[in-house]
Structure formats: C-alpha cells, structure tokens
C-alpha cells in the first residue's frame, strides 16, 4: 500500500517535522514480568530504571528476597525493547544478563529463574509468570486504554501529508481505525483504540 506505514511512538514524535500524519490504531501494554515465586508485587518507573541500568542489583532493595537481579530483555531492534527502554528512559544503558529474540523466550527465561525480571507485550503474558503492577496500576486492556498504566506504546499509521492515499490505502486505513477492526486488533495482541 503506497504512502502508508505502520510504526510506533517515534512516528508520533517526528510527524510534524517530517510533514506526516500519525493515526493511532492500537496500543500495546508492556507488562513487567517476574518469576511467580517473587515477593515483589509493585515497582515504580524510577525503580525499573535503577534496576535495568544496574544501579539497583539486589531484589531486597525493591521488597524481594536477597538475590542478584537477573535482567532479561529482547534483542536490539525489537519494538517491545524500544518501547520499554524509551518509556523507562534506559535507552542503550540496560545491563541485560540475557537478550533474547522472541517474547516467548523472555517469558520462559523469567519463568525458569526466580531472580529474573523482564518485559513482554500484555497479550503474551499468561499464568507462567507474574506481571507486577507499575506504580500501583496493573497492566490490563482497560488501564492501557485509559492511560493509567504507564508502560505502553501506540501503534501508528503514518501517512505523508503531501500525497493523497490511493483508494485501496484509504479504505485500509478507514477499516483499521473502525470499530469493525477492534476484534482483529485484539486477536493480533494489541488493544484497539476504537470500539
């Protein structure tokens, strides 16, 4: 489809200087996950920043048992990693013990290690790990949609203002931003913004 791209938050920030329009079609909650045995129930964005940059290295400093924190994340280039690192303000400064190529691998690594912490898209998190609250707010479709859960990213259609979309491209954008697309967006693992 000519003149239509799908991106994330970066597109919104850059749209005015790049002469493009950004239309948010969905949101993705990025859940903070720990091993089910962890005593930690809630973390602040600031504590996450301190943990992922190596300033805090022991679980006892955030309410857990004594033990070295094992940071698990996605590989460089991952959209989930980019979203997490941008929101928590740890871009290029994380001290990962493991950088994995798939969300399922991150979840499995956290499940297998009682000292691990990682992040994953809300839709991928099941009952094998525990999603902690962030500043007292759980990661759920409702809290992502209402904005109270802080670690989330938008999925954005980006279109060039100086080019008229083709009929097919416009029809696709219209459908993707309609209530009719909500179930498809949810099935794909994101939170629809139009219902």
Question: Each PLM stretch: what is its role?
Answer:
Residues 1-7, 11-12:
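Single conserved hydrophobic/aromatic residue that forms the stacking wall/gate
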Residues 9, 37-40, 75-80, 123-126, ...:
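Solvent-exposed loop/turn segments at secondary-structure junctions
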Residues 13-28, 126-145:
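Ligand-binding "clamshell"
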Residues 17-70, 170-173, 177-182:
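A conserved helix-loop-strand patch within extracytoplasmic ligand-binding domains
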Residues 22, 59-64, 96-100, 121, ...:
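Surface-exposed patches in mature extracellular/periplasmic domains of secreted proteins
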Residues 30-38, 152-168:
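A bilobed periplasmic-binding-protein/Venus flytrap-type ligand-binding module shared by bacterial periplasmic
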Residues 74-139:
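Ligand-binding pocket segment of bilobal, Venus flytrap-like solute-binding proteins
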Residues 159-195:
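Extracellular/periplasmic juxtamembrane helices and adjacent flexible linkers that interface
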């Amino acid at each position: 489809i000519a003149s239509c791209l799908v991106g994330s938050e970066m597109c919104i920030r850059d749209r005015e200087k790049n002469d493009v329009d950004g239309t948010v079609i969905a949101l993705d909650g990025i859940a903070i996950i720990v091993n089910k045995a962890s005593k930690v129930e809630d973390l602040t964005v600031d504590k996450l920043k301190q943990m992922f940059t190596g300033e805090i290295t022991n679980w006892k400093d955030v309410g857990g048992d004594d033990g070295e924190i094992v940071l698990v994340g996605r590989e460089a280039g991952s959209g989930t990693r980019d979203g997490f690192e941008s929101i928590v303000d740890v871009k290029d400064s994380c001290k990962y013990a493991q950088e994995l190529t798939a969300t399922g691998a991150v979840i499995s690594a956290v499940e297998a290690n009682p000292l691990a912490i990682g992040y994953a898209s809300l839709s991928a998190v099941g009952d094998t790990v525990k999603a902690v609250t962030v500043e007292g707010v759980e990661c759920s479709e409702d809290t992502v949609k209402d904005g109270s859960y802080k670690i989330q990213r938008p999925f954005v259609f980006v279109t060039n203002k100086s080019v008229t979309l083709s009929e097919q491209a416009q029809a696709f954008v219209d459908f993707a931003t309609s209530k009719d697309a909500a179930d498809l967006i949810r099935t794909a693992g994101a939170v629809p913004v139009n219902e």
